[in-house]
């Protein structure tokens, strides 16, 4: 193992000792009760099986076969989740064939950030992660189940499913993806039309035609945003079957992987003599493995929030400092849009997960000695699935990249360091996705222009007020202010300014989409402005340095003057309409971005 990876892992283990121990005690107490439906009073159990067929009723009464919960984020507006419509039938059939039972335990909400970008609904996006976690807990709280299958793909859905199911860590749990849609027009072409539209050089009809040629079929969007990062990290955690992440939907291989996930969940139950609860899989080593994979592929910045919240749900204390230290020793091995021109289907064809995991294991950057849903040891994830006469089998994946413009071996990385940079200075702490920014654009020092929402920046751009070197500051966008929306709609405007030769950067206490790139952006700045963070002291014209090379985020103002400044008050309008008022209690409970921007942080860490 690489000494820095070991050092960071041991530090996390030491820091987490108390909370992890308390978590494991909770899990063991739940596991010791045996099949939970066996402890239910007769009337309660009768309610739980009332809608089952006679065969399933008899199986569930005997308590000697697994009852597998299906928790699904299906809806047919969200392209990535539309394929889940068929999955419960496939799962139940596969379980019946081995004498087990599957029950649809509950549905969880799934919103599409692509639909809500720049709209009021985006202010519910991050909160939806915590709603999904609570919905998962409600689904599993009936205590009818011996194992669980979680069906989810997209941005906040998988983190929410993870947080919720980890609170039922005594259950063996397998995550079931749907797979990416086939490749449409190139991401480069799509981005170019967006930028032309921002400049007034493309019509709305041309923009819509471009967008619909990109997002065109059931399955996950093909850029390397949060949804595909979710799949990659869950597989590296050992919660997917090997190679399951990026098989296209509605194919024979995808259907057989879904059936096998159901069978495997049943095999991992005490009833089948091979008990592997989720809590044994998601430990400190698995969390470190997920961070390493995130860094090696330049994954979504949203996971600098989500991984912290997921770790907390397992009693593990992960920090941005841990991620930063790992970023200095983990090389960048993948170039997927927005970090390059390839999409996730090209990544899969170039060698995909099996090649990536093999390289990171051989380089001592991943812990091999972990438990997974496929069995002990991460080395089994260097295999890939295929069908042999209709039967699902695994073979060794490629030992060399099939396209080094997309995926490279450890000895020829795209960069010696990972794709994320911790930003620090007198403006607070934040993160930057440097893998998506050309080296010549990673350092910007310029006067600031301050905005309190995306619409104001767009209006200033259209009025020609931003034609200069510029650090755009969009503040009061943090978790407690307005739910920390993504500010992805700013990317075309700032990209135009950069292409015109201006030095441009963004600084915000909000988020950017995992699809954002090109323009240097110090995001998730903490403390947020509404909590008295330094961004609230900034004034138009202040000179700010955003240095993605050295991780510096600093206002160049005399210290005495800076400390004497008053804090700008937060805008009083907003947070009303589109249901936003219903989430006020959740915003008030949100922890800082550095703590995962999570409404559960205080209660989960209360065990410390």
From Swiss-Prot:
This is Phosphogluconate dehydratase. GO terms for cellular component: cytosol. Pathway: Carbohydrate metabolism; Entner-Doudoroff pathway. Belongs to the IlvD/Edd family. The keyword Transmembrane does not apply. GO terms for molecular function: 4 iron, 4 sulfur cluster binding; metal ion binding; phosphogluconate dehydratase activity. Its cofactor is [4Fe-4S] cluster. Catalyzes the dehydration of 6-phospho-D-gluconate to 2-dehydro-3-deoxy-6-phospho-D-gluconate. The lineage of its organism: Bacteria, Pseudomonadati, Pseudomonadota, Gammaproteobacteria, Pseudomonadales. It catalyses: 6-phospho-D-gluconate = 2-dehydro-3-deoxy-6-phospho-D-gluconate + H2O. The keyword Metal-binding applies. It comes from the Bacteria. [4Fe-4S] cluster binds at residues 154, 221. GO terms for biological process: D-gluconate metabolic process; Entner-Doudoroff pathway through 6-phosphogluconate. Binds 1 [4Fe-4S] cluster. It holds the Pfam family ILVD_EDD_N. It is an enzyme of class 4 (lyase).
